[in-house]
Amino acid sequence: MDELLGEALSAENQAGESTVESEKLVTPEDVMTISSLEQRTLNPDLFLYKELVKAHLGERAASVIGMLVALGRLSVRELVEKIDGMDVDSVKTTLVSLTQLRCVKYLQETAISGKKTTYYYYNEEGIHILLYSGLIIDEIITQMRVNDEEEHKQLVAEIVQNVISLGSLTVEDYLSSVTSDSMKYTISSLFVQLCEMGYLIQISKLHYTPIEDLWQFLYEKHYKNIPRNSPLSDLKKRSQAKMNAKTDFAKIINKPNELSQILTVDPKTSLRIVKPTVSLTINLDRFMKGRRSKQLINLAKTRVGSVTAQVYKIALRLTEQKSPKIRDPLTQTGLLQDLEEAKSFQDEAELVEEKTPGLTFNAIDLARHLPAELDLRGSLLSRKPSDNKKRSGSNAAASLPSKKLKTEDGFVIPALPAAVSKSLQESGDTQEEDEEEEDLDADTEDPHSASLINSHLKILASSNFPFLNETKPGVYYVPYSKLMPVLKSSVYEYVIASTLGPSAMRLSRCIRDNKLVSEKIINSTALMKEKDIRSTLASLIRYNSVEIQEVPRTADRSASRAVFLFRCKETHSYNFMRQNLEWNMANLLFKKEKLKQENSTLLKKANRDDVKGRENELLLPSELNQLKMVNERELNVFARLSRLLSLWEVFQMA
């Protein structure tokens, strides 16, 4: 696989140096001097990525990333021409730092004249690692299985923080500063755990290679390998080349995740260790799987209750590491623009979810991992309310005076005494209850019994939301390909309802369910006043949640001769919502940095070594109040950013 990737990186492109079309649309001056409001309408990605990189690497790195996001791939010479105040050396130095943190990818191309040029692309994966850096550390510490909680968690946090800040590192380099043998053994075992859990993977050329170019190289290679005198038609040749390219592409993509490439056995201790010279980096996809699980757990809480959601949480955590990727690399190649390819990709994804080993589970598997404090007894109804009503009705009927019975000779049989009839009735009711609840009594002894867990799994499988699918009796799996669109729709409706009101969500659902509707149909189905419907529709159109489609009645295209219908296009709506959330996150970061700049003198004074811990003595009352205000506003920014991030990532997931 290294040979394949090496060929892709050194492949000669005979097409020459191509010009970037987007360069005509946005000039460098526009990019560098653009205001926050204009950035929202032009490119929210540009605004967010520049603010993130500026906060971590400074102004120069932000300028380089801004150019790459706005104009696409650029060479060093082109970057120098477009960025004022930076020469070749400063651009190269900045690119080295960005490449080290995986914020930039590169590819070398050779023109017809033989001149080699290296082009640089921005890499959103590295930028997202900077965005999630604190959450990555917190998530890994939570998931790690360690003996000494405090000490080992601190070591794990230091390891992950070093990997994020350096981009990648080797175990040999990390242990070079450790003197104690016992500490070296502990750190080495923690590295093994991080690799086994999938949070650390081997860094390779793949992390610096553009996916689109890699796919294009593999496809052209296999297409050219087919003999020209082959009797196959051009369509079959392309289909065959595509299949072979997919096979090689999957092998290259999955290679960094293979533990055999990372772990080995120490001959001295016979224990598994990480190869000392292997460079390790953060596996963002593994972390995002955990974020996806949290989103699904929160959705389950709102739909099936908190107890069933806790059972669902164990099921997700059990299969999380082997679950499908958040975004399949094939979706980034442009291959799915073909409708047939998109459909076959969807079918294949559903098959993989069902057939992949480690993704199916049953109640016994979950019982081994349920926490001791979770008691499932009493979490399910033992009898339907309708049964009680029927029983009370029958008892009431029995209490009514019955018809008198006579013998042949006319003797009237007297009724039983009240005490005797009541005793017989109570004994009958007790017997019925014992028969109905006989099976449930066995479950009350074990809080984690398989039957109770299976009942909760059936609730998840029978829900309107496809939380689980049952392949065979008692065996389940999580259908991510069907569940993620439902999650997106649910979160989108929540945002619409919380910002525009419940009436907007009602209209949005009405239009989505009816596909393409007129205002007359909306008036008859939405059960709202006509004035309210029009004002709400205007808000939905402004937020790109609803679109207007003109349908001409005749050949005359004048407005008076046309009918205007409404429809919802989910792709456009989700994309607009994602960009809106992106801009709001970037705006929060922008305000935070601006706040620090305005109070830079006070912050420098408060951060001095001789002032720390003695602020009340050495700072004026006005300075203390100002410092308190700065800290409170910064905490407020982080809280709002966390909420926006949890919404934004839903629309980022494929």
UniProtKB/Swiss-Prot annotation:
Q: Per its UniProt record, what InterPro entries does this chain match? A: POLR3C_WHD (IPR055207), RNA_pol_III_RPC82-rel_HTH (IPR013197), RNA_pol_III_Rpc82_C (IPR008806), RPC3 (IPR039748), WH-like_DNA-bd_sf (IPR036388)
**Domain of life where this protein originates:** Eukaryota
Name a biological process GO annotation: DNA-templated transcription
Phosphothreonine: residues bearing it:
T27
* GO MF term list: single-stranded DNA binding
Q: Does the keyword Protein transport feature in the UniProt annotation?
A: no
Q: Where is this region: Disordered?
A: 381-401, 422-448
Keyword terms of this UniProt record: Cytoplasm, DNA-directed RNA polymerase, Nucleus, Phosphoprotein, Transcription
**Region described as Leucine-zipper: spans on this chain:** 581-602
* Residues carrying Phosphoserine: S392, S394
Indicate the principal place this protein occupies in or around the cell: cytoplasm
Q: Which Pfam families match?
A: HTH_9, POLR3C_WHD, RNA_pol_Rpc82, RPC3_helical
Cellular compartment(s): Cytoplasm; Nucleus
PANTHER family xrefs: DNA-DIRECTED RNA POLYMERASE III SUBUNIT RPC3, RNA POLYMERASE III DNA DIRECTED -RELATED
What job does the chain carry out?
Answer: DNA-dependent RNA polymerase catalyzes the transcription of DNA into RNA using the four ribonucleoside triphosphates as substrates. Specific core component of RNA polymerase III which synthesizes small RNAs, such as 5S rRNA and tRNAs.
Q: Which family does it belong to?
A: Belongs to the RNA polymerase beta chain family.
Q: What quaternary arrangement does the UniProt entry report?
A: Component of the RNA polymerase III (Pol III) complex consisting of 17 subunits.
Q: Output this protein's name.
A: DNA-directed RNA polymerase III subunit RPC3
Source organism per UniProt: Saccharomyces cerevisiae (strain YJM789)
Q: What is the lineage of its organism?
A: Eukaryota, Fungi, Dikarya, Ascomycota, Saccharomycotina
